[in-house]
């Protein structure tokens, strides 16, 4: 008996079924570096419209974590998709290199006693080492970029650029020096920016303290409450969770419009806001009678006695007072709170700060009767202050509460508000009297920015409305200096500061920040040097990264950027970090945001929605995923997850991603295997010669490509992945490719029927591999090499595939949608026959499908080809308004070659095991297919 297996056009490809990604991907990385893929893409894209995604620099300290990986992969997806969209989309990665975490690492390694210049030298070397470690991991993820020439905020050009940016902001009138309360970390020994503060729960004392009304003001107080006199002493009661700030108290604030009651109790008359009075009395275990009431404005300027210092303080009015908790009267220490400072400024209160840089009370702090405060930390002072209040009978209640409290983001320790002389970028400052405030300019810039997702707008708007002035000075060594010479008597910057800044910048450009720290003032000031002191403060690291639009985009890497950038992309925490610092510096320098759009992604959590931490043992490191499963799996997971919320990852989730990847890979393998003997230059058929189902597949591919391109442009990558996976499983694997196998394998190799199928498959593969390229970068490159056979080529040298035009595409899609509905009905009927044991496969059945209307017309138009669509040996459409599918077993012989069960099997005596169409395909003119 003849063996006809060799007569089939069986699929053949060098593209392996198993991806073996952990092994193959590093080889691709090496190949890309060897052939300078990124540089070649730049050459090919030269002259195209520019798209600028400006990289927010990760901090150069420690290995990258899964959040870093998500961030870089999202950026790479955008850069790749924009390149395929016909843009020139360079990507210059950057690193944030100055700041306290690195300085702390140096102190850990070398001790705290090392001199400042040595700290800077060691910090620079440490940061460079960290950059190389992180760079290697980012490259392993398949991220394309100018890795040989990244921007580093510690590059001399960047350091000089930051100094020039500061000069510009000073020039515009937004920079000022002031004694104000700022976030202060006792462990850092430095001021913190808003972005360096995070809120955690803290257990604190919550105390109610009585401030006695001064005897000279009791009559005035009685009158305010509509009384002729007071029966005894009266007290204004405050509530606070920071007893240590009471030595710095300068006033008690009330709300001018709220109603306050004077309540007579056994401990004297207490002034409490009406809304909180009942709860307060209950807290004190007291009963009382309301003697009188008045609004807060009637109490303005009443004198009180400080609870333990021999001085008087006044009641003042402020709209910051609320009825959320406490007593409705607020202890006011201008040195230890922003609201306190602002209201104190209005009333001309002194800014009395008794706390030093180390968080300890200074030597001149007045002693308490129970002991000295001087030399004690603020936390040590708390119990002592409570003891003093108790001794003076001024403590009405002392309890512990759990509440949200600001912590240093590095040390995870509670911070304090502490007034120090710092440099600020003023939100209410103006360039000149006729100009708008920086806050107004920033709010307008937010309004002009596009947000992905849209909710980011409200978040940044809210922050701009309420944020305080930006404290940009730090008391550290490893940072860009604030290069001002301050007059020894007035404290004012030198009148030639703008000119001096440029001279310093030129020196820093050559030698780095050490040029300032080692500078002799006389070199720039001459004889004036004796009258000035050189500042030692450094700039907030958020100023470093926040001004990259100036010193990178329009400085060191201007050729690779356009200003403003099209997009900034970072995690949701950067609304209060890089997005905000960039916005403020951009508005201060240029009067606009340095970006047109902001994209925000959520944080990565484990499968149960918990934050990842080493202590919980739920950390998934990107390096482990790449080494075990492959970077393309991590990239596919990133793209398939809706980043607008939290991104959930677990071993189980990654397993599902692997399964999805395998389906895609198997589809790609089928496509490649069936075009391996197809040369588009010589074998491509004109579209009017294609079979109808092939034209339909092309229409589906165009729908896919148009939809994916739109989703790429909207940065909705999870929708792209959904569409690609649906196309693979339903349109291709579950329909088109299943139907196509018979035609591909059994018709003559060069027949119109087979070439039509291959023409469609070639276009599908060309489009599909490009749509995958931004996401599964390594796999797409592997497919491209097999598809083109050109080792020196790359899918990233291309643009989206130009699919051939197709007339009547809408009608075709509608018609085949009906056919697919009918096919689903047929499949159910065949499954019932299979379950009943009447057939083994669909090819052993004959099908009658009864239907009417458009469905019948669609099915009948396929004629004898209908059986190929249903993968049956015999199918007929019957016009009948009573829809039904009748499937019956066939009794004929099965063709050994095509497996169809046909009456004409054996009709040709020379080939007794073949059906008529196989004989024709092998030895005759070949069967004619019209539709499928």
Curated annotation (Swiss-Prot):
PROSITE patterns: AA_TRNA_LIGASE_I. ATP binds at residue 614. Its cofactor is Zn(2+). Pfam families: Anticodon_1, tRNA-synt_1, zf-FPG_IleRS. GO terms for biological process: isoleucyl-tRNA aminoacylation. It is an enzyme of class 6 (ligase). L-isoleucyl-5'-AMP binds at residue 570. A motif ('HIGH' region) lies at residues 58-68. One of its GO terms (molecular function) is tRNA binding. Signal peptide: none annotated. Belongs to the class-I aminoacyl-tRNA synthetase family. IleS type 1 subfamily. Catalyzes the attachment of isoleucine to tRNA(Ile). As IleRS can inadvertently accommodate and process structurally similar amino acids such as valine, to avoid such errors it has two additional distinct tRNA(Ile)-dependent editing activities. One activity is designated as 'pretransfer' editing and involves the hydrolysis of activated Val-AMP. The other activity is designated 'posttransfer' editing and involves deacylation of mischarged Val-tRNA(Ile). NCBIfam families: ileS. This is Isoleucine--tRNA ligase. It comes from Dechloromonas aromatica (strain RCB).
